[in-house]
């Protein structure tokens, strides 16, 4: 008989919740994590008494009451509403695209005026079968919004021209003919008071966790310890890249502590101009309505994934989707491995 019933590779949301629930049911679990902390990409680090989202902004939102009630047992949430702002040159626009955006863009006041303006721009281009992301976006919202708020940001995000990206990446663009600038439609939304890390500490209380462990460096040993494995890493890496490597994008974060109480007046400002190298600036104190004397900002840069980088999201194109399907078929045939999480499924 093996020492553990479950070996859980990765202490992010999927791995931590699995470990918590399995332990509640009397199963013996070992959680291993390659980083020096739990929490995955939701990890928050306290800097200058501000909870800094180390791996980019994470706003908890759901319309599922069961999920909302479940997460409440680990933290109290505030009422934060995600209302990002887009900066193009010296202009600021409300996101998602709504009447505030259209008023700033064209000076229109009523929903009818805004709808007519967008329809006019779409019909002017006469795109019936979009061949790429650029044509798809223009066919949905017109050229003005595309040029100012979509093009530069998207090209930085993917590292490719919009004319080289497939149309299916954008199936729809949310357009609201109201003055509601709440980014999410979900019923429940907020930020855990005190940061996300406490959630994981409470989830993993009493469970054996080992940090700074590379599963692949000692794979045979760790696989021998448990009856079943829960794997939350890169699915292609698990299978030894036997069909080839999936392509990912990575991110770089540059933090600055500033001796001012308020830098940009909003938690998230997207920079949509191509010549600005970063995609957005996060000012973390605004997630929890902070009043500290200083502030912490993070500039977020999108970059090509290189070995040793953290993979954040897979490149969504035909080649990668076909490759993923092959790995998914392999995963589905594993009887003693559960794949989950952002990269595992």
Locations of regions flagged by a protein language model:
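Short loop/edge segments at beta-strand edges and connector loops
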Residues: 10, 81, 209-215, 341
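Active-site/ligand-binding neighborhood in enzyme catalytic cores
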Residues: 89-96, 100-228, 232, 239
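Short FAD-binding loop at a beta-strand-to-alpha-helix junction that anchors the flavin cofactor
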Residues: 331-345
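Short, well-ordered alpha-helix to beta-strand connector turns
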Residues: 4, 26, 207, 225-227, ...
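Mid-domain catalytic core of redox enzymes
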Residues: 25, 215-326, 330
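Dinucleotide-binding Rossmann-like beta1-alpha1 core, especially the glycine-rich loop
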Residues: 48-123
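Beta1/beta-strand and adjacent pyrophosphate-binding region of the FAD-binding site
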Residues: 2-14, 30
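Glycine-rich FAD pyrophosphate-binding loop
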Residues: 20-48
């Amino acid at each position: 008989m093996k020492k553990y019933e479950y070996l859980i590779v990765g202490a992010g949301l999927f791995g931590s919740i699995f470990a918590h629930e399995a332990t509640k049911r009397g199963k013996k679990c070992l959680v291993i994590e390659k980083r020096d902390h739990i929490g995955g990409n939701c990890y928050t680090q306290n800097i200058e008494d501000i909870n800094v989202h180390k791996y980019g902004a994470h706003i908890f939102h759901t319309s599922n009451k069961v999920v909302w009630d479940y997460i409440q047992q680990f933290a109290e949430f505030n009422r934060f509403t995600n209302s990002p702002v887009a900066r193009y040159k010296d202009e600021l626009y409300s996101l998602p695209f709504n009447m505030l955006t259209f008023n700033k863009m064209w000076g229109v006041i009523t929903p009818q005026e805004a709808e007519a303006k967008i329809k006019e721009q779409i019909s002017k281009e006469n795109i019936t079968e979009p061949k790429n992301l650029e044509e798809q976006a223009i066919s949905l919202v017109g050229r003005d919004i595309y040029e100012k708020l979509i093009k530069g940001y998207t090209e930085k995000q993917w590292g490719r021209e919009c004319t080289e990206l497939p149309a299916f990446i954008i199936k729809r663009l949310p357009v609201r003919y109201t003055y509601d600038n709440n980014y999410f439609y979900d019923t429940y939304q907020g930020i855990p008071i005190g940061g996300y890390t406490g959630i994981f500490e409470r989830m993993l209380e009493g469970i054996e966790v080992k940090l700074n462990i590379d599963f692949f460096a000692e794979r045979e040993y760790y696989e021998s310890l448990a009856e079943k494995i829960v794997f939350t890493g890169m699915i292609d890496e698990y299978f030894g890249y036997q069909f080839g490597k999936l392509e990912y994008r990575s991110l770089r974060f540059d933090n600055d502590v500033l001796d001012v109480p308020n830098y940009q007046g909003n938690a998230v400002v997207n920079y949509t101009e191509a010549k600005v190298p970063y995609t957005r600036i996060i000012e973390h104190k605004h997630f929890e309505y902070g009043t500290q004397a200083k502030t912490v900002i993070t500039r977020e840069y999108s970059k090509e994934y290189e070995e040793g980088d953290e993979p954040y999201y897979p490149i969504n194109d035909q080649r990668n989707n076909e490759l993923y399907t092959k790995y998914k078929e392999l995963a589905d045939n594993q009887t003693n491995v559960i794949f989950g999480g952002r990269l595992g499924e």
